[in-house]
Swiss-Prot record:
Pfam families: DHHA1, tRNA-synt_2c, tRNA_SAD. Catalyzes the attachment of alanine to tRNA(Ala) in a two-step reaction: alanine is first activated by ATP to form Ala-AMP and then transferred to the acceptor end of tRNA(Ala). Also edits incorrectly charged tRNA(Ala) via its editing domain. One of its GO terms (cellular component) is cytosol. SUPFAM superfamilies: Class II aaRS and biotin synthetases (SSF55681), Putative anticodon-binding domain of alanyl-tRNA synthetase (AlaRS) (SSF101353), ThrRS/AlaRS common domain (SSF55186), Translation proteins (SSF50447). It comes from Ostreococcus tauri. This is Probable alanine--tRNA ligase, chloroplastic/mitochondrial. Its EC number is 6.1.1.7. It is an enzyme of class 6 (ligase). GO terms for biological process: alanyl-tRNA aminoacylation. Its main location: plastid. GO terms for molecular function: alanine-tRNA ligase activity; aminoacyl-tRNA deacylase activity; ATP binding; tRNA binding; zinc ion binding. It is found in: Plastid, Chloroplast; Mitochondrion.
Amino acid sequence: MPRPGFAHATAPALAHARARISPVARRRVVVMRTRVDGAAKSLVTQLRLALGSTASRASSIASARRRVRALGTATNDQSTGTRANPNAEGKDNSGRGIRRRFLEFYEARGHSRQPSASLVPEDPTVLLTIAGMLQFKPVFMGQREREMPRATTTQKCVRTNDIENVGVTARHHTFFEMLGNFSFGDYFKREACEWAWELATNEFGLNPERVWVSVFREDDEAFAIWRDVVGVPESRIKRMDEKDNFWAAGPTGPCGPCSELYYDFHPERGLDGADLDDDSRFIEFYNLVFMELNRDADGGIKPLKNKNIDTGMGLERMAQILQGVSNNYETDLIRPIIDKAASMAGLDYASCSATQKQQLKVIGDHTRAVTYMISDGVFASNIGRGYIVRRLLRRVVRNGRLLGIKPADGQSAFTPSIAEVAISMSEECDPQVVKNTARILAELEREELSFQKTLGRGEEMLAELIEKAKDSKSGLSGKDAFTLYDTYGFPLDITTDVASEAGIAVDLEGFEKAMAEQRSMSQAAHQTVDVTAGNALAQVADELGAMSEFIGYDNISSDVSNVLAIVSGGESVEEASGGARVDVVLDVTPFYAESGGQVGDNGFLHSADGAVLKVTDVQKAGGGRIIVHSATVVKGSIKKGSQVSANVDENARRRARNNHTATHLLQSALKKVLGDDVSQAGSLCGFDRLRFDFNCPKAVTEAQLLEVETLVNGWISQSADLTAEEMPIAAAKEKGATMMFGEKYGDVVRVVDVPGISMELCGGTHVSNTAEIGGFKIISEAGIASGIRRIEAVAGAGVVELLQQRDAVVKQLASTLRVPPEEIASRVSGMQKDLVAAQKLAESLRGELAVAKANALVSEARAVGESKVLVARLDGVDPGALKVAAENLATQLGDGAAVILGSANGDNVGLVALFDTKVQKDGDLKAGQVLGAAAKRCGGGGGGKPGFAQAGGRDATQLDAALDEALQTLTTALDK
């Protein structure tokens, strides 16, 4: 019996019909047949997935049948090639709807929907999540067992390699959503191509005659599938080179040939000479990567264990197509943010100039990016991911400033108001963004205000540099661009944007050179790693194969440990003696190797034949496989293969252990007092003290520090028991254990729990009961970088030692000041008042002396035109007194006075200028300009108003010449 919706024909009739069908019509028949086959496969999938009740199965079957019937109708309608699939009409083409339809399409085909991964990837080779496949990279590489055969996601991504094109082209972004479907050793090319075509032309209703396909030039298999199975005409299949159609997630890792789908906005231009790179005609919207290879660090490519599928569809691009707008920015994913920025600038986007639209697009795109990045715990800084946040946000601020955007009434910054729109649109992509609203808005406000403080000065300096470059007909030097970056916080791309607007080029190579020089200088003091030894240890780890066993959680000594390797002088040796410095690898050790912020143990190794080694540091090597004991041979000689007893310094371990547990309590206390947004940025648990770095946008008050300290000591006095347990990372997350943001964890983790107080992932050593810590005292709190604070503290015996040190200081002060300890504060306060009074008296006397010296100079004033000019030098006079002297001289000289005074104090130079209004008018002179030139001659700078200016310099040897030039300038201008 024939299937509903299809005609039945005998074999002869079919043969006769085929002979009369044109090649084009025959290809359309193939397309229709492919779609029906795909729908039939989908029906089978739905039948398999319908595992519920009989009613549920019946519903699934009915749904599948309806889809097949709809597909039959749709293919008949589309055979004209003149319009999109009417079956897709009336469906939700909003960004939210497209996202939902994509995910449901693949869920119906056996894919498990997975949440978006963080923008901070576990992969150390990639700074930010740039593709949907990154969270599955270990599965693709065979490093982790697959949890499911198929998956589908919507992944938030950030890429900044095309930042200069943001707002310029129709579809470049820093932040975007990547819709994807993935197969882990399950289906491969044929199914991926068929489903991609069905999704595009049936679910989304794209006209199939407007869809083009590209394949890797050597991928004949993919070409054949598109042509023979899917039915795409050869004229709309393009073979492309490796740079276009061979995809990789990063410099290393899974990769493979890919096939891309393009939408044709202008089919009337014909097939001949069509260029898929022509952005005015085509937009690439779907990329299918046939992930079957792996690229290692050396660039070698090898087959993966399984053949996998990794796809990506740009949500913004599909929204542009389905919503019928001219660019991605005008879709409902970004346009509301742009409209908010435009309204704050008093503009209507539709009537804006091209430049204004570009600026608004930058604001819309970058605001999305920083909103999601801050939500994922990335705060503005000058390094790594933090610099990307700072760079993007400062571009938002600058473009907002150019548009005239002002903060809303009662607010000090405008970026939070714009970000609120991005946050309100984020829930389906990432529900955490709304929950992190307070963190996001606070960081945006803090960073915007910080940038505003230097933006004005930086813009002035950049304007001066550009004018000089124009006058000299040269570009902006890399050194100057770096000064703007280093001193004023100007990202390089802002400098290049402003310079480009003025037609000036920037020396990018010079900038990179200056940046490299600064890095090398800052790193020089920290280069203590023995690279030779490191290479030797890595080789040892490879040769041994086995891992060192750490038994130090329960033991501080080992009676029998075998010496597996000895490294001395950067080489693996069989024996070492006579005070040699060595690195020793044991098979079993109680020594804790430095990690997680806790320092390595100290102690001794003893051999049966009398050798003694003093261990001063312990580190991991060989990717963490071996534990290396850095030691000095104190007595005898140590041999490879010998047996030793290993003994940890119990007192040092106790102190490190106390400090480590105290850091856990400290983090919990900070979260309780300052809020849950506080997160660890680093730590050091040493023998003498602890250090804890944390993300916090504001300074911590003394009252808050006292509250934190009191909380920690209260928990110590509660004598709470600690537990340490290994468990799957999923279980740890479910329990709510605190994890250090950005840290890479394995599948099994160790959870240290102080019930009701603290629960963290940690591999360090800890007390068994909080009472063992004894006490806790904060020594200092300060900011160490933008948005990062540092607390230094002591615990246990360190508290007693600190009190003893401070007691000794108090006794010494009491003795020196000859007062009891309790009266020290009042005595010091009185001395401070006396000192201030004495300083004021000294300043007054210096001023009087300067005036007296200046009075003697009145007679030296020159009459130039109708003005009275006095340029003189008064050494040893501070800036305040120099100003008083200049004002006194100007008063005595009266109308037409022009006074410039200079003073040398060691190598430093002080300058001051006062010009009467007549001088300013007659000579067209400004005090700030004249004095600025003099200061520059002295290696400094400064300026001021037309009538008054102050400046300084660092080269007193040039003061006379600078004053002579100033006098010449005045004389020339006024002698008319």
